[in-house]
Regions:
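N-terminal intrinsically disordered, cationic/polar leader segments
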Residues: 5, 12-22, 29
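Beta-strand elements of well-folded, non-transmembrane domains
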Residues: 43-47, 58, 98, 107-111, ...
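Short, well-structured hydrophobic secondary-structure segments
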Residues: 31-73
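Glycine-centered tight beta-turn/hairpin loop motif at sheet-sheet or coil-to-beta transitions
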Residues: 14, 45-49, 87, 111-113
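DNA polymerase processivity clamps
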Residues: 73-97
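Mixed-charge, glycine-accented linear interaction segment located at domain edges/termini
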Residues: 107-136
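Intrinsic, low-complexity N-terminal interaction/targeting segments
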Residues: 31-38, 88-109
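Short amphipathic beta-strand/extended segments with alternating polar/hydrophobic composition
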Residues: 18-22, 49-57, 105, 114-122
Length: 136
């Protein structure tokens, strides 16, 4: 399963973070009946652009959805989305304090020749958009 549509999670005119659909042939296949979602995350600014694919399944999926819901509801908290595989060490980490959001991440594997690290500030709307799109 993947997200329904490509969507912009955040765009302040300088930086843009998007959630992307993943073609069926590139989605991770897990055990029938167990929660599993595969999606892409892309980041771009005036000079760089990068993307990576993440798969959340089983208790990793349930835990991250609970962490996102808690952070969004309280406007405080943090969570880290990462792929649980040996093929990448990409991640996106979100820390919210009183509705102000700090986002940092790495798209692509640090051990490959191409990866992109980024960091920017946003607000709680990014977390709400993310939660809405990955919850099924």
């Amino acid at each position: 399963m993947t997200v329904k549509n490509d969507i912009v999670l955040w765009d302040n005119g300088r930086e843009k973070l998007c959630l992307l659909t993943v073609p069926n042939e590139h989605q991770y296949k897990y055990i029938e009946g167990i929660s599993c979602i595969t999606f892409g995350i892309s980041y771009e600014n005036m000079n760089f652009k990068g993307c990576d694919t993440f798969t959340l399944f089983d208790h990793f999926y349930s835990n991250i959805v609970n962490e996102i819901e808690s952070t969004y509801t309280s406007l405080n908290g943090s969570f880290r989305i990462y792929d649980v595989g040996a093929d990448t060490d990409g991640y996106i980490e979100l820390v919210m304090t009183n509705g102000k959001l700090s986002v940092k991440g790495q798209l692509g594997a640090s051990f490959s020749s191409h990866s992109l690290m980024f960091e920017f500030e946003a607000d709680q709307t990014l977390v709400g958009n993310l939660l809405q799109e990955i919850t099924f």
